[in-house]
């Protein structure tokens, strides 16, 4: 939410007392963000994938049929369609801090953000439309694919 507010030059007002209040405030910032972003032309140029993500990118595409969200345009469109804040992660994807993709599971769309700390890949976020919680089975499916990729990297003694 911070990056969205920063991008639209909005001062955050953290005057809520309940989880419901936080969700309502998040959604109002998100709506304002989408409205302002829609008014500017989005860059469709795909970001160059950082080396540390390349092997996993191939594995995920071939195994799970994912759609990488690797441009400002794709991230914003995903956020608008899914009604969540993935559009605010443009900088994080561009710099390689995050690897974000969309995936369909049981005919429902989900958005997943992966991050890496000390060569360990983590599922940082995995949400459906309107920030609905993803099924445990999808977490397991993605996690198993990541684990297979990491085991291969360790076996080859390749450092990411």
Where are these regions (language model features)?
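Glycine-focused motif/segment detector
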Residues: 1-160
């Amino acid at each position: 939410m911070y990056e969205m507010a920063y991008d639209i030059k909005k001062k955050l007002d953290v005057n809520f007392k309940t989880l419901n209040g936080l969700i309502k405030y998040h959604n109002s910032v998100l709506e304002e963000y989408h409205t302002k972003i829609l008014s500017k032309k989005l860059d469709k140029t795909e970001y160059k994938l950082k080396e540390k993500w390349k092997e996993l990118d191939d594995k995920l595409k071939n195994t799970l049929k994912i759609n990488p969200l690797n441009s400002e345009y794709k991230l914003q469109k995903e956020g608008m369609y899914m009604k969540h804040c993935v559009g605010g992660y443009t900088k994080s994807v561009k710099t390689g801090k995050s690897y974000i993709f969309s995936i369909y599971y049981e005919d429902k769309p989900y958005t997943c953000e992966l991050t890496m700390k000390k060569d360990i890949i983590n599922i940082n976020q995995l949400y459906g439309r309107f920030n609905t919680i993803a099924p445990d089975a999808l977490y397991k499916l993605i996690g198993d694919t990541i684990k297979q990729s990491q085991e291969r990297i360790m076996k080859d003694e390749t450092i990411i």
